[in-house]
């Protein structure tokens, strides 16, 4: 499996509820490598670009209002198959349909407050990483336990 990067964001509800450490821990325990991390208050412009594919949908304004309502923790994770694996860790978009053991299954109840966003594919991941991070904000590094994470 190829080493990939994906974009993950803890939304304002997850930050306000103090779930940042819990969520970071789940990705770290899985064995993924954190290569970008920052907390920010997204501008309406950034939010509009991020959710641009939904611009013509009736819920677009609500998405922008919510993601700009408080701080967001933006992350870039790296690892073998990280895009698909992150989606499994995160769980279904609708928390009541998310499996127990997933982030949304364990920590969210309502689709409008579903705690976390994760890229849904390679093209989206690249777009979102480039949108939220500059190249200088991403750190290539090798964990000391790398040989224990994946078979070479």
From Swiss-Prot:
The alphabetical list of record keywords is: ATP-binding, Cytoplasm, Kinase, Magnesium, Metal-binding, Nucleotide metabolism, Nucleotide-binding, Phosphoprotein, Transferase
One GO cellular-component annotation of the UniProt record comes to: cytoplasm
Query: Could you name the active-site residues?
Result: 117 (pros-phosphohistidine intermediate)
| Places the protein is found | Cytoplasm
Q: Where is the signal peptide?
A: none
Q: Which Gene3D superfamilies match?
A: Nucleoside diphosphate kinase-like domain (3.30.70.141)
Name where it mostly resides: cytoplasm
Enzyme Commission numbers on file? 2.7.4.6
**Chain residues that bind ATP:** 11, 59, 87, 93, 104, 114
Q: Does the keyword Metal-binding apply?
A: yes
What GO terms are given for molecular function?
ATP binding; metal ion binding; nucleoside diphosphate kinase activity
Query: What is one Gene Ontology biological process annotated in the Swiss-Prot or TrEMBL record?
Result: UTP biosynthetic process
- Which InterPro entries does the UniProt record give? NDK-like_dom, NDK-like_dom_sf, Nucleoside_diP_kinase, Nucleoside_diP_kinase_AS
Catalyses: a 2'-deoxyribonucleoside 5'-diphosphate + ATP = a 2'-deoxyribonucleoside 5'-triphosphate + ADP; a ribonucleoside 5'-diphosphate + ATP = a ribonucleoside 5'-triphosphate + ADP
The top EC class is transferase
Task: Name any cofactors this protein relies on.
Answer: Mg(2+)
Q: Which family does it belong to?
A: Belongs to the NDK family.
**What does the function comment of this entry state?**
Major role in the synthesis of nucleoside triphosphates other than ATP. The ATP gamma phosphate is transferred to the NDP beta phosphate via a ping-pong mechanism, using a phosphorylated active-site intermediate.
Describe, as the record does, how this protein assembles with itself and its partners.
Answer: Homotetramer.
Q: Read off the NCBIfam families from this record.
A: PRK00668.1 (NF001908)
| Protein name as catalogued | Nucleoside diphosphate kinase
């Amino acid at each position: 499996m190829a080493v990939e990067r994906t974009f993950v964001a803890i939304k304002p509800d997850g930050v306000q509820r103090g779930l940042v450490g819990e969520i970071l821990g789940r990705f770290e325990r899985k064995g993924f490598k954190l290569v970008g991390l920052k907390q920010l208050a997204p501008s309406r412009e950034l939010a509009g670009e991020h959710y641009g594919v939904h611009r013509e949908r009736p819920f677009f304004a609500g998405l922008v209002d919510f993601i700009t309502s408080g701080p967001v923790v933006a992350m870039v994770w790296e690892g073998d198959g990280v895009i698909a694996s992150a989606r499994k860790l995160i769980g279904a978009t609708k928390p009541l349909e998310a499996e127990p053991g997933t982030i949304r299954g364990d920590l969210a109840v309502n689709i409008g407050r579903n705690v976390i966003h994760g890229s849904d594919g390679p093209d989206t991941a690249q777009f979102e990483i480039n949108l939220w991070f500059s190249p200088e904000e991403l750190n290539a590094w090798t964990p000391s336990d790398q040989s224990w994470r994946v078979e070479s």
